[in-house]
Amino acid sequence: MSQADVELLRPELVFFDLEANDAQELFDGLEDRLKPLGYLKDTWRAAIGEREKNYPTGLACPTAQIAIPHTDPVNLERPYIAIVKPKSPIKFQPMGGMGDEVEAKLVINLGIMRDGGQVEMLQKLMGIFMDEAKSANVLSQTTPEGMVSAFGGYLA
């Protein structure tokens, strides 16, 4: 993981107040917040919805249920990592299409533009959520600054 990827974690990209009934509503809310900040192209919303439909990103890890939606860099204006801790869990289809729906308590939207960066980040995130203490620390965060600090410490 490059230091540049860790620098994509910013308090302005951490959301605790997003309410959504499903992944599509979550993407609408993210677009409303990220587009004015200059992170997304007009194609992002349709692209992330289509990618999620074809390649679901819900993960039922031993310590938490999460989702890691992302899309191709061509749909981004600039790189980012957005973190959403929704008011109530959001249902995502399971990665690989096998198993029950995932009730994601945390959604990490990757907007990485570096070649191979998304795969590397997915591996790092899996390491966090396979570890009970790290996962508990991340899930216990209640401020954007705390969330950035927790993730930054594990991803560096």
List PLM regions with ranges.
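Cytosolic covalent-transfer regions centered on His/Cys nucleophiles
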Residues: 1-156
